[in-house]
Every structure is written in C-alpha cells, then in structure tokens.
Amino acid sequence: MSLLHSILLGLVQGVAEFLPISSSGHLAIVEQILGVKGAAEVPGFFDVLLHLGTLAAVFVAYWPEIWEMIQEFFRGISDLIHGTTPTPVPPARRMILLVIVGTLPLFAILGIKDWIESLSSNLYVVGGALIVTGCLLFTSDRVRKGRKNEHSARMTDALIVGAAQALATCPGLSRSGTTISVGCFLGFERKFAVRYSFIMSIPAVLGANILSLKDALGGEVIWKDVPVYLLGVLVAAIVGYACIRLLKMIADKGKFGAFAYYC
C-alpha cells in the first residue's frame, strides 16, 4: 500500500466514522476505486487499525464523561459489595447501564458476521444502504425535539437504539447516523443522542476489532507496510476528533438533514 492510499483511507475513515455517512460504505467504495484490496487482503488488517484510530478520537473527545463512568463503575461495585443503592442513581451509572443494554443486540448477529462483512464487496448493497441512511437522517430532522437524556432515557430505549446499531453493521448503513436518528425518534435530546451514540460505539468497536483481528492476522500481512498503516491511523484519529467536534456543534442546532442529501 502506498503512503497516499494510507492517508486517503485514514481521511475517509476519520470523516465517515463520525459524520453520519457510513465509514464502512465509503471504505468499501474507495478501496474498490483504488484497487488496494488484493489477494493478500491487506486492508483487512488496515481496517482494524483505522477503527482503533477513530476509537482513540472518541476517548479524547469524551474523556471527562468516560472517566466519570469508569469511576462510577468502581463505585457501583463498592455499593454492590456493601449492599447500598444511591438515590437517585448517578447519571454516569445510568449511562453505563444504557451502554451495556444498548450493546446486547450485537450478540444476536455474531453468527452472521462473515456474511455481513461479505456484503461490502457488493456496491449495490452499499449504495442502497447509504440511501436508507439518508432517509433516516432526513426524517430525524422533522421529528419534535426530545428531552430524554441519561437521567430519563429508559432501558427499552437503549435496547431499541442497540438494535439499530446491530442493523447498522450492514456496509453502507451509518452506525452513527442510524443510532442518532433512532435516538431522535425515541425522544432523545439531540446532544444526548450524539453523545450516547459515540460512547456506545466503544464496546462495539472494541468487540468487532477483537473478532476481526484474528482473521486479519491469519492472512498474509505485509509487516514492512505497518509504518505506512500507522500514518493512516494517525490521520484517522486527528480527522475523527475534528469531526466529533463538528457534529457536536451541528447537534446544538439539531440539523442533520444536510448529510441526508449527501448520502
């Protein structure tokens, strides 16, 4: 893989992972255009690294919230040991529960993971899924602004958003676009819908990469290209962080429709 290809794929991943336009769909299209997916399936390993780069961007952008959740996790264990329950439940602890419940539907699709990944080679599927993403975003702009946040969102809401996240593993369906839109349909505050979508992505992306890493390393990885890969990862992380900041500002205005026309 050339340096230019690595930078370009890192740029696409950083932009498309967080802006609601589907990173998997765009990577599939760009990889086919560039012809970088050869017999050695090198991009399989590279794709894993790219997702870890954008995952780092989530940690940086939401570190205060994530750190509070980590602390609250251990407080929760302490409360469990001592048989105490704080009233009301701290927001960070509710957020942990919402993320756990939202992650559960992903286990239902583990058995068809390989089939879902194979769809990325079919640009008709990818294109159709991008259209669905656009329709979701267009509709989400036209629903009444909600008021639910980590204080008031129900566990059933989290389960529904989690089911949407599981469906969004289909290449071309934007994970962020789908989960944010469904959150808006359920009455989430737009800021909370964005925050919940990105924080919920952490266990999803980690789990997906752990499952994919074994397969990726099982192929013929060209280790001398790893420095080139790492440059793409750095680009993905920096651009991803900038896109999270941008989407936060867009959420303040509650306007996601512009992305619908792009999709």
Provide a role label for each language-model segment.
Residues 1-263:
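Multi-pass membrane proteins that catalyze or facilitate reactions on polyprenyl-/lipid-phosphate substrates
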